[in-house]
């Protein structure tokens, strides 16, 4: 199988072809996703909640991310694999580079970091040293204590303009992908159209270039609160492989996320 690359996603954006991505944390699910053609995966610090049972992503360490990244890479050797740098793993550019090197050696193709213009120097340093970067704006879970909970971000002209400014700054610094989480559809559209790099949405409507879901949300195995943007594809299909195929098909056709999964 031909490897999926950042260039593959750039071509999807140019061709206006939506693409699906998903979180993965272990060998078996990564292998299954790859076999079904779902070839862009994220080892997210969401594993702190979905795998480790914490109430936030904050306890996750670089060692945790590296461990799960290696497992996913063994299951999906040709996927485009993103890995989160967890809380306090990129407080300085130098620290970011050291920790990025750890997860890249474990098998990641790219690191994802949360934050806006304050990260410009870090993004520049990483990209200059051959570490591809995916930005993450909107609801950034590592900042949950500042936000006062998991809330929609970017509502109102001032907040929306700031997120757009952040997105443009990250792109100019060298970021090659951007995740937008829990923002109004209208703002997601503005940002997606303003950037040359692919934008992946989660809770950002169907106007972004791609979509991502936490695998536990996609299969309805998340305990407690279910995010508005989540959809249980396993409930409709009764089979994990069929659920993966349906998720991909609905993203590519624009059916998912629907209005009921979106914010304004």
Curated annotation (Swiss-Prot):
Belongs to the PanB family. This is 3-methyl-2-oxobutanoate hydroxymethyltransferase. GO terms for biological process: pantothenate biosynthetic process. It catalyses: 3-methyl-2-oxobutanoate + (6R)-5,10-methylene-5,6,7,8-tetrahydrofolate + H2O = 2-dehydropantoate + (6S)-5,6,7,8-tetrahydrofolate. It is found in: Cytoplasm. Catalyzes the reversible reaction in which hydroxymethyl group from 5,10-methylenetetrahydrofolate is transferred onto alpha-ketoisovalerate to form ketopantoate. GO terms for molecular function: 3-methyl-2-oxobutanoate hydroxymethyltransferase activity; magnesium ion binding. Homodecamer; pentamer of dimers. Gene3D superfamilies: Phosphoenolpyruvate-binding domains. The active site is at 181 (proton acceptor). It comes from Escherichia coli (strain SMS-3-5 / SECEC). Mg(2+) binds at residues 45, 84, 114. Its cofactor is Mg(2+). Its EC number is 2.1.2.11. One of its GO terms (cellular component) is cytoplasm. Keywords: Cytoplasm, Magnesium, Metal-binding, Pantothenate biosynthesis, Transferase. Binds 1 Mg(2+) ion per subunit. CDD domains: KPHMT-like. SUPFAM superfamilies: Phosphoenolpyruvate/pyruvate domain (SSF51621). Pathway: Cofactor biosynthesis; (R)-pantothenate biosynthesis; (R)-pantoate from 3-methyl-2-oxobutanoate: step 1/2. 3-methyl-2-oxobutanoate binds at residues 45-46, 84, 112. NCBIfam families: panB, PRK00311.1. The keyword Metal-binding applies. Pfam families: Pantoate_transf. InterPro entries: Pantoate_hydroxy_MeTrfase, Pyrv/PenolPyrv_kinase-like_dom, Pyrv_kinase-like_dom_sf. It comes from the Bacteria.
